Amino acid sequence: MYRVPLLILIVALSLAPSRAADRKPIRFWNLTLHTVVSLQLSPAGQQAWGRDQCENDRDHEVDHDERLRITDVVPGRYDIRLKDKTGRVCVVKNVDVTDGAVFSIEEKDLSGCGG
């Protein structure tokens, strides 16, 4: 007697999309002058750098004017550490990362870079 409603409930739940699947991707847009070879995010002010997001790209680098899908990051404010092909390492502080949106870093955003 309870088997049919239970079966219907199980099927309905398995077909319902998960919230994670509904989320639109976060993307980084490289507007610097050089190809980015490493990109890490840390919650703003914490220096707790996450994994290299360039691993998400087919060739593991983000050319000028290319976009990169960001994974395993929740929306919030982040410091972004990037390394480009010239060997320059830069940190851009307090970047707003929004679900389903693109955040960009331009050459003018880069200061205090080391190499």
Where do the model's predicted regions map?
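Structural beta-strand segments of beta-rich domains
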Residues: 22-26, 66
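Hydrophobic h-region of N-terminal signal peptides that target proteins for export
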Residues: 9-18
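Structured interaction patches on ligand/partner-binding surfaces of diverse proteins
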Residues: 21, 83-114
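Intrinsically disordered, low-complexity Pro/Gly/Ser/Thr-rich segments with frequent PxxP/GP/PP motifs
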Residues: 49-74
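Asparagine-centered strand-capping/turn motif at beta-strand->loop junctions
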Residues: 27-34, 43
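A short tyrosine-centered beta-strand micro-motif
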Residues: 78-80
